[in-house]
Regions:
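Conserved PLP-enzyme active-site core in the AAT-like
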Residues: 32
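Active-site-proximal beta-alpha core segment in soluble small-molecule metabolic enzymes
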Residues: 2-4, 9, 13-16, 23-24, ...
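Class I S-adenosylmethionine-dependent transferase superfamily signal
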Residues: 29
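Active-site anion/phosphate-binding pocket segments in diverse small-molecule metabolic enzymes
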Residues: 2-23, 73, 92-94, 99, ...
Length: 380
């Protein structure tokens, strides 16, 4: 934890983001793909809770493209000065097309109706709108089907005069699992559709299929890969190999705002779910579920205080949580607890934190709320 954090007044809970780690992780991902492949940085959901604008600025000289989930996320990046290519991976409503075309943002097209609406909007502007085509190879989420009907529809999209189809992509649904058989089937389906389009004289310049799990665990394929969770120093699952030297980029902290000693038999928190079986010293932290700490975590979870693990007790409240610090006498009002991150020789990773909450690291990071300030360390 940077010493400068301790000197900042008025903070109750905060996240520290190491942009140098993000840059390092991007370079690690780049080294895993083929030299002639492009690498896209996924910064959707506020860069998985790390801050999309700050992450994009840090990677702007490296990333070939940025990806977001919504039109609002894309426009915010443009307004904050990001000049690189921005792809919207998810749904963009028709009434956003004017702004997207005007700001040179690339939407995803996954239906004919959407394509015709984008084409008509571009015609009004006197421009050709960029687009990527989504292909469903087995995720069953969005995209044209990987069959004859889907191929015919994609050909129709590519024939529209005011759409410049720059890319086509699909998404691995099980690449983070040990069994890669379905991922290989998805790759085969994707290749087959691209080959059928090429046979019809349609050569879409950027084909991309690999997500973070694909980058980590599968051979490089096609023209571009999409780095998501690995940018932030975390692996997609426990089932992928761990040969990359990833650095977690986010740490989460909260201050101790209250200390008291309770007697045996005294209950702590809502529902009286914890009852002390001995005299217990309790610290209250300034972080709760409104900050992104799941209520579920109280059963198994810990924080770090003074370089030691301290058990969460009682239910996590909206704005506070209670910790057993009986065996950590150095804790005082204003002490800083590490919720995710390292303190001395001890570390709580986002993955461990997520296991306590019965979820995945992605959800934990994205769930850290807006009221938690993000502080940035830009050294590499």
């Amino acid at each position: 934890m940077g010493n400068f954090i301790r000197k900042l007044p008025g903070l109750r809970a905060w996240a520290q983001v190491d942009l140098g780690a993000v840059i390092h992780n991007f370079d690690e991902a780049k080294a895993k793909i083929a030299p002639d492949m492009r690498l896209l940085a996924v910064v959707k959901a506020d860069a998985y809770g790390h801050g999309a604008t700050e992450v994009a600025h840090a990677l702007e000289s490296r990333a070939d493209m940025f990806a977001v989930a919504t039109a609002e996320e894309a426009l915010e990046l443009r307004q904050d000065g990001i000049k690189g290519d921005i792809l919207i991976l998810g749904y963009a409503p028709d009434d956003s097309f004017d702004d997207l075309i005007e700001n040179d943002i690339t939407p995803t097209v996954d239906t004919l109706e959407e394509a015709y609406e984008l084409n008509d909007t571009a015609e009004r502007f006197g421009r050709r709108a960029k687009a990527h085509i989504a292909l469903d190879t087995g995720m069953s989420r969005i995209g044209f089907c990987a069959n004859e009907e889907g191929i015919a529809q994609i050909k129709e999209v590519c024939a529209l005069p005011n759409i410049d189809v720059r890319g086509i992509f699909s998404h691995f649904s099980t690449a983070d699992e040990e069994d890669k058989s379905f991922s290989l089937l998805q790759k085969e389906r994707f290749s087959s559709v691209c080959a059928a389009l090429a046979a019809a004289g349609i050569n879409i310049p950027i084909k991309h299929l690999s997500n973070s799990a694909g980058i980590v665990d599968l051979p490089p394929c096609f023209d571009m890969a999409r780095a998501g969770i690995i940018l932030y120093g975390l692996y997609p699952s426990d089932e992928v190999e761990r040969s990359m030297k990833l650095k977690p980029a986010l740490s989460l902290y909260a201050k101790v705002n209250f200390l008291k000693e309770i007697d045996e038999g005294t209950a702590v928190g809502y529902g009286r779910t914890f009852v002390a079986n001995k005299k217990t010293r309790v610290a209250t932290l300034c972080a709760g579920y409104a900050d992104g700490i799941p209520r579920m975590i109280a059963r198994d979870g810990y924080v770090l205080l003074c370089g030691k693990r301290a058990k969460i007790i009682g239910r996590v409240c909206m704005d506070q949580m209670m910790i057993d610090v009986t065996d950590i006498p150095d804790v005082k009002i204003g002490s800083v607890a590490t919720i995710i991150g390292r303190d001395g020789k001890e570390e709580i990773t986002a993955d461990e934190f997520a296991r306590w909450a019965g979820t995945i690291s992605y959800e934990i990071l994205c769930g850290i709320s807006k009221r938690v300030p993000r502080l940035y360390d830009k050294t590499k």
